């Protein structure tokens, strides 16, 4: 497995991987209209290209023999400042792995990169949101020391989901 930096030229790849991963994991939970609205707002190539061009965004793509396995986006701006006491909490925006790649170490490699990057920019905390019923992801984050910080809302189209805000304090 190889991790490489993403650039705006990777927007279509990251957008497709994001769309496909979200649909595989959660698509069955939403109406077609809500899902389409969410995907257009979050996983359209133009949206992703703008994110990847943002100097405050860091993104790594995991590949195996050129085949994409996953990606991780880290936003180097304060995340959810209304919660917690961290001085500089940044957001782990997305950590998505392709369907069928669970257990291959992709998520762990991307998380290790994200935490090293966060420490490298002087963050004292990393925050992320996770669906309240996604116990698999919650267990993954707990293994790294993330803890529940707050309950927040997450919108997929017009559907509100209960989401947990997790935080990892960095030493």
Show which residues each predicted segment covers.
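Short glycine-rich hinge loops at helix-strand junctions in the catalytic core
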Residues: 105, 122, 145
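Conserved short alpha-helix immediately C-terminal to the canonical SAM/SAH-binding motif I
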Residues: 110, 134-137
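Extreme N-terminal starter segment of soluble prokaryotic enzymes
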Residues: 1-2
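Active-site acidic-Proline motif in GNAT/NAT acetyltransferases
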Residues: 98-100, 104, 132-133
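Alpha-helical segments flanking ligand/cofactor-binding loops in enzyme cores
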Residues: 12, 138-139
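Conserved catalytic-core motifs of GNAT/GCN5-like acyltransferases
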Residues: 79-80, 127-130, 142, 147-164
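Acetyl-CoA-dependent GNAT
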Residues: 5-11, 16-30, 36-100, 108-113, ...
């Amino acid at each position: 497995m190889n991790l490489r930096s993403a650039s705006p030229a990777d927007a279509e790849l990251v957008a497709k991987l994001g769309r496909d991963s979200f649909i595989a994991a959660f698509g069955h939970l939403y109406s077609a209209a809500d899902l389409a609205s969410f995907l257009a707002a979050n996983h359209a190539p133009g949206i992703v290209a703008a994110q990847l061009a943002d100097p405050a965004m860091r993104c790594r793509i995991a590949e195996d023999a050129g085949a994409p396995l996953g990606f991780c986006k880290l936003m180097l701006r304060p995340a959810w400042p209304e919660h917690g006491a961290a001085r500089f909490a940044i957001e782990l925006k997305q950590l998505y792995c392709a369907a069928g790649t669970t257990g291959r170490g992709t998520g762990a490699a991307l998380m290790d990169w994200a935490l090293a990057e966060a420490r490298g920019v002087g963050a004292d905390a990393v925050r992320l949101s996770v669906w309240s019923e996604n116990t698999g992801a919650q267990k993954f984050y707990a293994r790294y020391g993330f803890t529940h910080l707050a309950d927040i809302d997450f919108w997929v189209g017009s559907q509100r989901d209960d989401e947990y805000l997790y935080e990892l304090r960095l030493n």
